């Protein structure tokens, strides 16, 4: 145990003395965060001073939410951002890729809903691979049953129905079994791609 103050698997201890630097971490991620702290100390202090540091997060999850639905964001941008996240010890990236104004990841279930600019599945796999290198979890965010204008452009028949029998353009009709099965098929496709949690509501 790094410290009795926490059971966090991101806790680490740094001991600096005349014999050098000793870093002990509760996990691989903890060791990485310890190295980041050493890097920061060397830059800010122009070297290291003797002493002991015991560090651990107050919040187990530190998430960056990126809206890549309303505006296309490239794979290269995500790769750079993941490296920056590591320096800031942010351990979760939420990719909000579907919205009223866009659907930005390749969709094999229904290509008609995808925006003109989008990330391919191979690009997403590269993003996830890079995130894994830095101990960062990637969570997809697929808006539903609201904020689905982009989907309903292709499938207006799945929209909510008003008292006058007209379809709304912004909300999925969850009383329609076909609409429910359709959105479920999208969930399954992206759960298979990301192999992680999936966020299925408005942010």
Predicted features along the sequence, with ranges:
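Residue-level detector of conserved catalytic or cofactor/ligand-binding positions
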Residues: 195-203
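Contiguous, structured surface segment used for ligand recognition
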Residues: 1-59
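Active-site mouth loops of central-metabolism enzymes
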Residues: 63-77, 171-178
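Aromatic/hydrophobic pocket-lining residues that form π-stacking "cages" and hydrophobic walls in ligand
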Residues: 81, 127, 138, 200
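Hydrophobic faces of well-ordered beta-strands that scaffold small-molecule active sites
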Residues: 62-66, 93-95, 138-140, 201
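Generic structural signal for well-ordered alpha-helices
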Residues: 82, 124-128, 184-191
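Aromatic- and acidic-residue-enriched carbohydrate-binding clefts of CAZyme catalytic domains
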Residues: 98-134, 147-181
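Catalytic domains of carbohydrate-active enzymes, especially glycoside hydrolases
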Residues: 77-99
């Amino acid at each position: 145990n790094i410290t009795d103050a926490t059971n966090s698997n991101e806790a680490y201890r740094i001991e600096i003395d005349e014999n050098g630097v000793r870093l002990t971490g509760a996990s691989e991620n903890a060791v990485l965060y310890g190295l980041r702290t050493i890097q920061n100390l060397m830059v800010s202090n122009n070297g290291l001073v003797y002493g002991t540091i015991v560090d651990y997060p107050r919040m187990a999850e530190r998430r960056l939410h990126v809206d890549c639905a309303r505006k296309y964001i490239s794979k290269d941008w995500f790769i750079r951002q993941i490296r920056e996240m590591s320096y800031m010890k942010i351990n979760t990236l939420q990719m909000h890729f579907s919205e009223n104004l866009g659907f930005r990841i390749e969709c094999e279930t229904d290509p008609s809903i995808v925006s003109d600019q989008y990330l391919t599945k191979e690009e997403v796999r590269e993003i996830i691979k890079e995130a894994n290198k830095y101990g960062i979890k990637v969570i997809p965010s697929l808006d539903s049953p609201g904020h689905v204008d982009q989907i309903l452009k292709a499938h207006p028949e799945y929209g909510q129905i008003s008292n006058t029998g007209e379809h709304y353009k912004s909300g999925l009709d969850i009383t329609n079994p076909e609409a429910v099965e359709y959105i479920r098929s999208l969930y399954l496709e992206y759960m298979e791609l990301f192999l992680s949690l999936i966020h299925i509501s408005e942010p």
